[in-house]
Structure formats: structure tokens, C-alpha cells
Swiss-Prot record:
Residues 166-175 are annotated as: SAM motif III. It is found in: Vacuole membrane. The keyword Membrane applies. This is Perivine-Nbeta-methyltransferase. It comes from Catharanthus roseus (Madagascar periwinkle). A motif (Vacuolar targeting signal) lies at residues 138-144. It comes from the Eukaryota. Belongs to the class I-like SAM-binding methyltransferase superfamily. gTMT family. Keywords: Alkaloid metabolism, Membrane, Methyltransferase, S-adenosyl-L-methionine, Transferase, Vacuole. GO terms for biological process: alkaloid metabolic process; methylation.
Length: 295
């Protein structure tokens, strides 16, 4: 993030989302997209399953947990850990030490409470911190997991360098993000209308901007990584946006948003609505990117 003011704005947004219980019924303890079979009609109960499934699908895509126990990572860093749901799920399901980091103090408090409520205090730990300047030593973690965090980071290239820095030699890195389309060979920039749409989303959700898949390739090329893979999960995530807008713009849903979250909640929904429109227009995609740090 470019300035302390921007960092504080992001922290404040998630503090309000967390403390006011905005969208709690939909998201539960997971503040990220879900993974559905293509063509599924999402429901609230199905989304509670989908937001967990996307974690397992990402780990499967990255070939992290195989039958070979010798290759099992000893620890995980979840960057932009939110309310701790991802850390708690991975620690419980895969019996692994997990550390989460978030810039939001309220999110970290929620995360610690969640871990304690499930008896996982010895498996999971959480830190308030800046993802661009993490306090961890070089090579500290054998798996790095990032889900819909990079959109908040101003200096995305530095962020990529930072997560590679804290990754151990041979560690797998998994990133799920909302990415903008690649430029065509004849383009020097996105169309003005597209730029306007992305700026609107960023203003609503305190995002710093979106990178493209080409950006990932350019940033990773000089780094000590190998075996990069990319998957387009846009259609797998799409049912969530339909569900969110259906619930939020119902009379009951909209009144609940205003009562519980005020203008902050309304901005979140308007931002998600604009993301949905950008996806429909092929401006944005939901992507999974994975690669391994060289040994």
C-alpha cells in the first residue's frame, strides 16, 4: 500500500465489516469468493460450503498435499487472513501449523477467538502486520497462501517479492485473485471506460487496483521460482455474485445492510455489483496462480 492513510482505510473497512457483522450470513468466517461447479445456482447454505471448497481446490491445484507425507509442508502463512477461517480450516483438516497476518486489528481479534473456540490455539497464530513488510525471517514458511489480498496492495510487485522472500526453498505459493484482462498486442492501456469501471470498484472497496496475468509473469520472471501454473476460475466463482446481489437487493437484505452496516455496507455491495458487471464484460477474471520457490 502506498501510504499510511491507505493502509488505515483498508484496516478501517475490514474492522467495520467484522465488527458490524456485515454480510455475516453469507460469508461466515470466510471473507472471499467461493468455488462452485459451473452452472450451479448458489444458495446461502451452499455458499458456506463453497467458500471452504475454494481453499481445498486451490491446494489441490497446487499439488500441495499428496500421499507422500515427506512432502507435506510443516507450516503455512496465510497472507491477508481475514477472520481466520482459512487458517483454521487448513490447520484442522491438514493437521498443520498455520500463521495468519492481516492489517486489521479487529479481524485478528476475531481470528484468535475463532481458533480458541475450536481448540486450535496451539496450531494457529495470528499477527497484525503489513504484507509489504512482514516481520518473518527469510525462508520461514513451506506454503504461502494468498486469497483475494493482492487487490489491496499498492506495490504489487514488491508484495510478490516479499512472499517469495518468506517462502522456504521448495515452498509452494498459491494466489487466488481478481485479475484484469491482458492487453492486446495493439493496446498500450485499458479502454477509458474500463479504467473508469475499475476505479469505481477500487473506490467502493478501498482496493489499490488490479493486476493482469501478464503482470504476474513479468514480476515472477526474475525471481527464484519455477513451475508456474494458472487457472481461470471465473465461472466457478460466478454463482456467488448472483447470490450476493439477489440477497443484498431484496427488501429484507437491503434494510438489514443499512441497519447493521450503514454506508460502509452499501459501498461493499455496490463494489461487488460493479465487479460482477466487469466479470460479465470480460474485464475481470477470478484466477488461481501457483508456483514453487526454487531449492
Amino acid at each position: 500500500m502506498a501510504s499510511m492513510g491507505e493502509k488505515e482505510a483498508v484496516a478501517e473497512l475490514y474492522d467495520k465489516v467484522t465488527s458490524n457483522g456485515i454480510l455475516e450470513e453469507l460469508f461466515g468466517e470466510h471473507l472471499h469468493d467461493g468455488y462452485y461447479e459451473v452452472g450451479t445456482v448458489a444458495t446461502i447454505s451452499a455458499h458456506r460450503v463453497a467458500v471452504v471448497r475454494i481453499i481445498d481446490e486451490a491446494l489441490r491445484f497446487a499439488d500441495v498435499f499428496t500421499d507422500d507425507q515427506a512432502k507435506k509442508p510443516r507450516n503455512i502463512l496465510d497472507v491477508g487472513c481475514g477472520k481466520g477461517g482459512t487458517c483454521v480450516h487448513m490447520a484442522r483438516k491438514y493437521d498443520i501449523q498455520c500463521t495468519g497476518i492481516s492489517i486489521s486489528p479487529d479481524e485478528i481479534q476475531c481470528a484468535k477467538h475463532l481458533a480458541a473456540s475450536q481448540g486450535l490455539e496451539n496450531k494457529v497464530s495470528f499477527d497484525v502486520g503489513d504484507a509489504l513488510n512482514m516481520r518473518y525471517s527469510d525462508g520461514s514458511f513451506e506454503l504461502i497462501f494468498v486469497i483475494q489480498c493482492i487487490e489491496h496492495i499498492q506495490d504489487k510487485e514488491k508484495f510478490i517479492r516479499e512472499i517469495v522472500r518468506v517462502a522456504a526453498p521448495g515452498a509452494q505459493i498459491v494466489i487466488i485473485s481478481t485479475a484484469c484482462r491482458n492487453l492486446s498486442p495493439s493496446e498500450k492501456s485499458l479502454k477509458p471506460k474500463e479504467e473508469k469501471t475499475l476505479k469505481k470498484i477500487c473506490n467502493y472497496l478501498h482496493l489499490s487496483g488490479f493486476c493482469s496475468l501478464s503482470d504476474y509473469s513479468n514480476w515472477l520472471t526474475p525471481l527464484p521460482i519455477e513451475d508456474m501454473k494458472i487457472a481461470d476460475w471465473t465461472q466457478n466463482a460466478a454463482p456467488f455474485y448472483t447470490l450476493l446481489l439477489r440477497e443484498a437487493f431484496s427488501i429484507k437484505g437491503f434494510i438489514s445492510l443499512l441497519m447493521n452496516g450503514g454506508w460502509t455496507a452499501v459501498k461493499v455491495i455496490l463494489g461487488m455489483k460493479t465487479i460482477h458487471e466487469a466479470i460479465e464484460n470480460d474485464l475481470l477474471k477470478i484466477v488461481a496462480v501457483t508456483f514453487r520457490k526454487t531449492k
